[in-house]
Each structure stands twice: as C-alpha cells, then as structure tokens.
C-alpha cells in the first residue's frame, strides 16, 4: 500500500471543466447583457453615489465617546441645542471694528436667530459690552459669534444648516472694509464632504488614464485594453449602483471617505482581476492550448484566487463595521458590499467577455510572453533562500525603522485646500486670534444645588485655578474670571483696601470734628474764666447779702417802732378819723379827703412792717444759700479745667490715630492695587451683594445654568489643541478638576469635558482600539480564507505573516515619504484605513503565487516555485503596479487625507508586489520545503512516472517549460 501525496500527478486525469465555468461559457452573451442592464438600471433609476452620499451622509461623531456625551449634556443644560454641530461667524475689518461693524453684526445675529430651522442658539457675546472683550481680538479688528446648528456634524441637516448660515452672511451687505466668514467644525466637515465629492471625478479620470496607459504598454492592444476597462467600468458602475441603492433606501449611511475608497478599490481590484484573467488565458494560449482549453485553464487558475481576494477585501473592510468610531464603521458595509458586487461581476462578466472576445482573437497575446527573467529570479530564490530572505528583511527594516518616529496629526485644516471657505475663515481668525481661541475646551460641573453663593464661588474659582495651572493651558474663562483672568477688585486685600478707601473719605470730616475740639477747649477756657470771675462776684454778693440781712433787721425794728407810734396816734385820733370815713361827701371836701388819705397811709405802715418781716426771712434764706452757692463754683471750675485737659488730650490722641489711619490706609490701598494689578487670585472672594448686581447677573447667564446647578469653564490651550501635546493635556485637565473639587461641597458634582482636544482624545483612544479590533478580526478572517483555499496551515500563516510584515514596512515607508521628506504629518485616519485595506489587498498576490505553487507542485517543490514565479511574475507585477498606481491616483484629491491613504496603500502594494511576493514569500517556501504545506503531505521531488502528453499540452510545448526542474 503506497502513501498518497498531495503533489502526486494523475496521468489519467482529464482537464476539469467546472460547472460555473461551463455555465458562463454557455451563457456568456446573456451574462454580458444582464450586467449591462443592471448598470443601466442603477444609472437611470438611482441617483449617483455622490448624490446619495450627500443625501444619506452620516455623522462621523462617536456618540458614546465621553466628549460627545458631555457636549450634548452641556447643550441641554444651557438650552443651546442638542446637536454637536457648531459654526462660527468671523467678522474682520481693515481697521478696528466700530459702530458700523456692530450694526452689521447686530443685523446678522437677528437674522441668524430668526432661522429657527437651522440655528438652535447664538452666543451673542460681542453684542453685550460686559462680555464683548471675550470674543474680540486684541487689535480690535476681529470678533466672532458662535452658533449651535441643527443636525449632527456631517449629516445632511448639518450641511444644510451650514449653507443656510452662509446664505445669510452672503445676502447681508457688509460695510466697506468689513468681511464675514463662516467657519468652524461643521463648516469644515461640510466643505470636506463637498471637496471629496468634487475630487471624485478627477480621481476617476486620472486613474482611468493611468490604467489605460499602463495596460496599453502591457498588452500592446487598444481593443484588449478598452474591453478590460469596459469590464472594469461595469464592475465599478454595478458596485457603486448597488451601494447607492442601499444608501438611497436608507439601509446604510455614507461618507465621502467611503465613496472615495469604494471607487478606488473597485477600479483597482477590478483591473487586477481582469489582469489575472487575461494573463492566465494568454499564458495558456502561449503554452499551446486552444481557446476553449485556455478558457477553462484560466478559470481553474484564477476563479478561486479572485473569489478569495474579493472575499478577503470584502471581509477585511467589513471588519471595520465592528469598530466603534463612525469614521471606520461607515466604511465597512459600503466597501464590503461594493467589493462583493465587483467580485461577482469579475467572476461572471470577466470570463464571459473573455469567451466572447476570444472567438475573435481579441485577447490572444500580441507578442511572446517572456518568463525567463522571472524564472531566473525564482532560480536565485530557491538556490539561496536564506540570503534572499535576509536581504528582503533588511529592505523591510527601512520602513520598520521609520515607524518609531511616526507622528500623527488631528488638524483637518492641514489636509484641506486653502481656498475652501472654512479654511479661509480659519485663516482670517488666525490673523487676529490664537489657534486655541477658535478651538476651546468646555468643562462643565453639575451639582445638586444652586451654586450662586459666595461659598460655592470660592470652589469654582479654586477649580478654575486648578485647571489654569495645568501645563499647556493659557487661559480659563469662568464666572469668576469672565475674561480669562481674575476679575478686578475681587481679592480680599483689595476689598479691605476699598473699606479703607471709605474710611479715607470720612477721615477729613473726622479730623475737622477733632479740630472742633480745640475750639471747644478754647470755649471751655473762656467759661472757666467766667466762672472764676463769677465766683469772686458771688462771694462779694454773699457778704453783701449778709450785710443786707443785718440792715433789714434794723429796718424791721424801726418799722415796728414806727408802727407802734402810728398806732398810738391812730388810737388818739380814731374818733375824728371815723368822721372822715363816715362823711359821705368826704371826697368832695378837700380837707376831709386829705386827712382820710393820711389815715389810709398810716394804715399801710402796718402792711409795710409785715412785708419787711417777710423780706427779712427771704434775705436770711439767701444769706444761708449764698455761701453754699459760692462753694459750688470752685468744683465746677475744676471740672471744667479737667474737661478741657481731657479734650486737649483726646484731640492729641485722635490726631495721632488719624495720622496712623492715613498711613495704614496708604499701605492697604497700595496692597489692594498691587493684588489687583498682579491679577493675584490667591484670596478670591465675592460678597453676597455682588450677586444682586444686574451686570453680574448678565454675566452669569453665560457661565451658569438658569437654575444655578451647573457651571461651565472655557479652557484655552497655549498651543494647537489638536497637537499630540494638546490631546495629552485632557487627562491632566480632568485630574486637576477632580483634585480641585476634592473635600469641597462640590466634591460629588459631575464633571463633563468637551471641546476640540477632548474630542480628538476620545477619537485617538477609540481609533487605537478600533484599529486593534479591525486588524485582529481581519487577520483572523484572512487566515481562515487563506487556509480554506490553500488547505495548508503553514502556507496560510506565511501569507498572513508576510502581509503583516509588509504592512509595517509599507506604513513606515509612507511615514518616511510624508513626514520626513515632504514634512507633512500623516492624518490620524491614514493608519487605520490603510492598514485594513493593505491587510486585504496585500494577501491577493501572495494567494495567487501560493495557489500557483500548489498547481505546479507536481514538478517538485523547487521546480514548482520556479515555474510559479515564471508564470505569475509578470501578471502579478502588472496587477500590483496597476493597483498601486490606482490607489496612488487618490493623491490628486483635494482632500490630502485621501491622497495620503492612497499613497500609503500604493507604497504597500509596491512593496508587497516587488519585495514580498517576488522574494520573501518564495524564499520562505523554499526554506520550509515540504513543511510549508503542512498538514498536507507532499513530495520534495516529483514521483517518477512515464511521460504521457496530455490533451491540453501538445508535444510542441517549449522545452523550457520542463528543463527548469531543480528538485
């Protein structure tokens, strides 16, 4: 019993005619007409792919990224919109902006606010003198207003909103010397979409022209080239049409990257498949086979390769659907579906066109196919496999060594033409503002209570200071620092100095009142002198009163004596007296009336005596009181003198105090001015009355939510926020915010961080994970496909391994070209997009080569390698060059990122075609020998069997085909 080997030849086997090949052979014309009908239908009844792309464009924003969630939350809390689409209107003047510019600006703002369909909110800061400085340039020649637009960035509504804003700006006449620009992230995204669509026709024309020239040089037949290009055109039209149908129906979304990549892949892959088909057919014809036999030989030799290649490309691009980033996710289904359609067309239309054309000899070789050069290459490889492998690895090191220096860029502006409107707007902004001014970070904290109080404002200022101290941050605008610096007059030293200022205003009056104390002291001195004089006078008056008492006592005695004598006289004359009172007519008798009057006067002496007695009593009381009264005056004089002394002392003391207060006030004022001038924020404080200020309440609307539960901070970078340094600062900003709130009443507040650097920080992390996911899934899928086709584990592993090595070297060469030679950093999208495509297309040529190894293995391992190299060398090289040039033609796109992706893929294909497929893979196969085909069992040398000419190989076959056996 003999062992069966995989490379044992079956001399009795007849040429196999696969069922599908026979069906295509039989129904070639209907197949051609059917595919043409499909092209007509999708062209006539379905909008173009570019039109569908505009109609069904999807947002490229990763909705589950923290920065985008923060953006949505900030918009909701501050009632500024629910989209991630923002734009800016820049107003630039030749001279500092004046009243005319303000009037023009107010008109624009009014129209923008009136467009509720496209503009969700307008941050009118320049219209308020309190906040105008925050959006005006230092030279006063530019200002801007930020708009929140309807529709998420990249969607049709967002693009429509950008056009609506531009229409308003263009339709509003600007004053002389004033110009307005519409720019910002959404405007840039819309312009990028338009530029990509506009460049698509140019890319296609350049690609077709280059392919036509290259194929004409290869085949030397215009008819062959035209038929091949028509076939490729049908593949492209069908692939684009089917994807357009899916997009138009809403089944899938599209982006400008997906449209560009699908078009280039369909053209390149379709051309490659055509080259494979024609090349294998011409090889069979030159080997002496008839047209039908050559047709079946072609199908057996290329169908599985085309299918495997197409499935590999479709599968690898479909793996992008597993990514989380819409940038990559949106490439997956459109490219995969398009490639499946292209493969279906290539596997049916290609052989059908070949069959029909071969009837008229249109695809027969016009010259002898030279294989000797490639056989010599194969001979060198199998004779010295290790040196060849070392040499190819050394060449690969050129690219691999460039990888550590790889630096990416996230600034989309650098990859768009300067003439697009958004870039013109950014250029105008750059003339007056820093790059960071147009690309701020927005941090918001949300608490469970109203923060409009002095205590929470201390925490908010602490948070602002903590963020400001992060390296790379140039300014932090918040409610405690609306213009990015500490508010004037908010430091405790300055507030103390302001209190002293109030005291200084009253100290003059206090000093005047103190000087009045001197006048009062003088008045008191006068009073003391008066009291002293009064004391002496009252002392004299007391002695006089005492003498008056004695005199009055004597008068009283005299009066009493006089009264007694008058009484005696009255008693003697009483009878006569009675007459005078009894006489009725006494008043008429002079003598009577006179005597009567005398008697009345004598009666008054008695009253006088009584009154003198009373007077004597009063005088005695006065004589008693006057000494006491005189005794009271010296204490008064002494008290007055003491009071005068105290007033003089108080005046002296107050004068010293006032002088000291003036000196202290000068120091406090100087300290307050110093803290204010230095913008020192170490002792920030806002008193409660500030919160009642109308101007401050207006400012709070920009930085605090309506309920006071949320506060936001506008953070500006020192450099470009989209640089690696700016992106790295996001973690530091978040950490600084968390540390600043630690141990404060706002410790449990939620922190949201959005903005340019925050977005690209999330994109950078997401891209790394997506690249890892897509690359691993693609490698696994490619390995499975290779394993199914080759049935050899080691061979499949070698194909995948060499592709991975080629991938690293190819990307390194792209880094070398763009970063070190052209001095342009690669866009961050280039790595992921080119890696996935290179993983897919890079395995094609290795698959074709290894499949040919398997076909020629019956001649022996080494001889099979030589024959395979000779048979596929020119075909694969032509296909690789065409594919590479096709992808490199993307460099004519207005989008430099598309050009970078194309050139990176092109360099990878050149490296894979000229180095990996030509030298590395054959050398590994030669080194491994029969282990290359494990677990298949193969003979190292061919089995000895009698030579029997086959029907498909006439005796006239060139001897060179069998004289190259080396094992």
Curated annotation (Swiss-Prot):
- Cellular location of this protein? Cell inner membrane
Show the segment(s) annotated as Disordered.
943-967
Q: InterPro entries annotated for this entry?
A: MMPL_dom (IPR004869), MmpL_fam (IPR004707), Mycobact_MmpL (IPR050545)
Q: Which residues cross the membrane?
A: 26-46, 210-230, 242-262, 303-323, 333-353, 384-404, 769-789, 793-813, 821-841, 875-895, 913-934
Which Pfam families does UniProt cross-reference here? MMPL
* Membrane topology designation: Multi-pass membrane protein
| A GO-annotated cellular component | peptidoglycan-based cell wall
Keyword set, alphabetical order: Cell inner membrane, Cell membrane, Membrane, Transmembrane, Transmembrane helix, Transport, Virulence
Upregulation: Transcriptionally regulated by MmpR5. Repressed by iron and IdeR.
- Cleavable signal peptide: none
Q: Which Gene3D superfamilies match?
A: Multidrug efflux transporter AcrB transmembrane domain
Q: What is its main location?
A: membrane
How does the annotation summarize its subunit structure?
Answer: Interacts with MmpS4.
Q: Which family does it belong to?
A: Belongs to the resistance-nodulation-cell division (RND) (TC 2.A.6) family. MmpL subfamily.
Q: What does this protein do, in the record's words? A: Part of an export system, which is required for biosynthesis and secretion of siderophores. Essential for normal replication during the active-growth phase of the murine tuberculosis model.
Record's protein name:
Siderophore exporter MmpL4
Q: Which organism is it from?
A: Mycobacterium tuberculosis (strain ATCC 25618 / H37Rv)
């Amino acid at each position: 019993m003999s062992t069966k080997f995989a490379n044992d030849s079956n001399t009795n086997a007849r040429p196999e005619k696969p069922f599908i090949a026979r069906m295509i052979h039989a129904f070639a014309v209907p197949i051609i007409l059917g595919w043409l009908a499909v092209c007509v239908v999708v062209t006539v009844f379905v909008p173009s792919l570019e039109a569908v792309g505009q109609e069904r464009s999807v947002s490229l924003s990763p909705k589950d990224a923290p920065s985008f969630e923060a953006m949505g939350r900030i918009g909701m809390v501050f009632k500024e919109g629910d989209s991630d689409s923002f734009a800016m209107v820049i107003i630039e003047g030749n001279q500092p902006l004046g009243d005319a510019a303000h009037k023009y600006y107010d008109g624009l703002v009014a129209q923008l606010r009136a467009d509720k369909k496209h503009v969700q909110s307008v941050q009118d800061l320049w219209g308020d003198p309190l906040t105008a400085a925050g959006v005006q340039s230092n030279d006063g020649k530019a200002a801007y207003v930020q708009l929140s637009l309807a529709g998420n960035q990249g969607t049709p509504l967002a693009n429509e909103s950008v056009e609506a804003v531009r229409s308003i700006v263009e339709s509003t006449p600007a004053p002389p010397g004033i110009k307005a620009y519409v720019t910002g992230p959404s405007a840039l995204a819309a312009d990028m979409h338009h530029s990509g669509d506009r460049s698509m026709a140019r890319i296609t024309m350049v690609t077709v022209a280059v392919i036509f020239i290259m194929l004409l040089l290869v085949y030397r037949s215009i008819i062959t080239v035209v038929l091949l290009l028509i076939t490729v055109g049908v593949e492209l039209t069908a692939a684009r049409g089917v994807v357009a149908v899916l997009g138009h129906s809403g089944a899938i979304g599209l982006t400008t990257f997906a449209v560009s990549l699908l078009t280039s892949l369909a053209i390149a892959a379709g051309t490659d498949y055509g080259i494979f088909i024609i090349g294998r057919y011409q090889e069979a014809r030159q080997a002496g086979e008839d047209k039908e036999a050559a047709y079946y030989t072609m199908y057996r030799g290329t169908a599985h390769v085309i299918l495997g290649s197409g499935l590999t490309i479709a599968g690898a691009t479909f793996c992008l659907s597993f990514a989380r980033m819409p940038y990559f996710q949106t490439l997956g289904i459109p490219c995969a579906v398009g490639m499946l359609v292209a493969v279906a067309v290539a596997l049916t239309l290609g052989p059908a066109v070949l069959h029909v054309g071969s009837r008229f000899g249109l695809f027969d070789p016009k010259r002898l196919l030279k294989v000797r050069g490639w056989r010599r290459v194969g001979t060198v490889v199998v004779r010295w496999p290790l040196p060849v492998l070392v040499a190819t690895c050394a060449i690969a090191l050129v690219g691999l060594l460039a990888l550590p220096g790889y630096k990416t860029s996230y600034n989309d502006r650098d990859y768009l033409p300067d003439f697009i409107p958004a870039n013109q707007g950014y250029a105008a902004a750059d003339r007056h503002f820093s790059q960071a001014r147009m690309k701020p970070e927005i941090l918001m904290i949300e608490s469970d209570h109203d923060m409009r109080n002095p205590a929470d404002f201390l925490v908010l200022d602490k948070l602002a200071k903590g963020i400001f101290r992060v390296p790379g941050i140039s300014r932090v605008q918040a409610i405690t620092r609306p213009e990015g610096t500490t508010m004037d007059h908010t430091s405790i030293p300055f507030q103390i100095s302001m209190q002293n200022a109030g005291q200084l205003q009253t100290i003059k009056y206090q000093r005047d009142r103190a000087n009045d104390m001197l006048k009062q002291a003088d008045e008191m001195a006068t009073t003391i002198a008066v009291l002293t004089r009064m004391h002496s006078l009252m002392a004299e008056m007391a002695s006089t009163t005492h003498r008056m008492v004695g005199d009055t006592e004597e008068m009283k005695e005299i009066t009493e004596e006089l009264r007694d004598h008058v009484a005696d006289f009255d008693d003697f004359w009483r009878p006569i007296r009675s007459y005078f009172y009894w006489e009725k007519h006494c008043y008429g008798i002079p003598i009577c009336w006179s005597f009567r009057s005398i008697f009345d006067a004598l009666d008054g002496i008695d009253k006088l005596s009584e009154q003198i007695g009373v007077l004597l009593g009063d005088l005695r009381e006065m004589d008693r009181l006057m000494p006491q009264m005189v005794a009271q005056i010296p204490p008064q004089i002494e008290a007055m003198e003491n009071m005068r002394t105290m007033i003089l002392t108080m005046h002296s003391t107050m004068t010293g105090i006032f002088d000291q207060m003036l000196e202290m006030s000068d120091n406090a004022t100087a300290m307050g001015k110093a803290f204010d001038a230095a913008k020192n924020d170490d002792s920030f404080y806002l008193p409660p009355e500030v919160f009642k200020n109308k101007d401050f309440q207006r400012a709070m609307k920009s930085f605090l939510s309506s309920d006071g539960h949320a506060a936001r901070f506008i953070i500006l970078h020192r450099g470009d926020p989209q640089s690696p340094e700016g992106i790295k600062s996001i973690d530091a900003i978040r950490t600084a915010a968390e540390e600043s709130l630690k141990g404060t009443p706002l410790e449990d507040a939620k922190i949201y961080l959005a903005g340019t650097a925050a977005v690209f920080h999330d994109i950078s992390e997401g891209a790394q994970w997506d690249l890892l996911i897509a690359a691993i899934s693609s490698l696994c899928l490619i390995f499975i496909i290779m394993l199914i086709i080759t049935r050899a584990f080691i061979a499949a592993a070698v194909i995948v391994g060499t592709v991975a090595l080629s991938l690293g070297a190819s990307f390194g060469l792209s880094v070398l070209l763009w970063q070190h030679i052209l001095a342009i950093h690669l866009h961050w999208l280039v790595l992921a997009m080119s890696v996935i495509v290179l993983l897919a297309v890079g395995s094609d040529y290795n698959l074709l080569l290894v499949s040919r190894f398997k076909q020629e293995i019956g001649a022996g391992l080494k001889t099979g390698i030589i024959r395979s190299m000779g048979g596929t060398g020119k075909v694969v090289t032509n296909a690789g060059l065409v594919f590479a040039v096709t992808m490199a033609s993307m460099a004519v796109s207005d989008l430099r990122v598309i050009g970078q992706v194309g050139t990176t893929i092109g360099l990878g294909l050149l490296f894979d075609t000229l180095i990996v497929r030509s030298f590395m893979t054959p050398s590994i196969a030669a080194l491994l020998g029969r282990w290359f085909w494990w677990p298949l069992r193969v003979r190292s040398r061919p089995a000895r069997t009698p030579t029997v000419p086959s029907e498909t190989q006439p005796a006239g076959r060139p001897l060179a085909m069998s004289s190259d056996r080396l094992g």
